[in-house]
């Protein structure tokens, strides 16, 4: 049994971790803020640029009024407009850099054990935790090549798990594009809804 999605979570930038906002083993939602590295220098830059932006907007307004009365050249007006556009671009860049200091869940799932603490210096290669989407689960199995054409996409199958008496139902959704030349088998995947998240990935299933 395989998770529907799984990823090692890490930051897009480097910095000292100042927040960890998740409990190990808990369910998290897509977009949820999980952790954050220090962004104070970036916030200071943003505040400075926002202050400059207000002044630049005032200059453009005044220059436009003067231009309408032919009291200033077109070139002077275009210069202040360019300065305003540059400031807006700089603000967009800083805001993008600030967003990279935030680690957010890329999808709904269960977050595993954390590998860092507040105060840890993290880089893009630092794994914070693993995020696993366990609903649905993928059931991966292989059939001998002589049966490759017998298992169709959309077909249902039943499987059992060791230690559980009940039978689970999954639906085939994908087939490998070719026969494995070594094992002479075709790998097939089916989806089990796992709506209550009662079954964990990593277990071996017996296909009926």
Question: Each PLM stretch: what is its role?
Answer:
Residues 19-21, 27-33, 104-147, 152, ...:
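Surface-exposed patches in structured soluble domains
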Residues 112-113, 161, 166-208:
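Structural microfeature recognizing short secondary-structure transition sites
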Residues 41-96, 114-117, 139, 183:
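Alpha-helical coiled-coil segments
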Residues 36-48, 135, 166-171:
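Short, Lys/Arg- and Gly-enriched loop/turn segments at beta-strand edges
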Residues 46-57, 143-148, 172-179:
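Short, compositionally biased
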Residues 1-12, 89-106, 131, 139, ...:
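Short beta-strand-turn/beta-hairpin segments enriched in glycine/proline and small hydrophobics
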Residues 11, 22, 39, 96, ...:
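Short, conserved catalytic or interaction motifs in soluble domains
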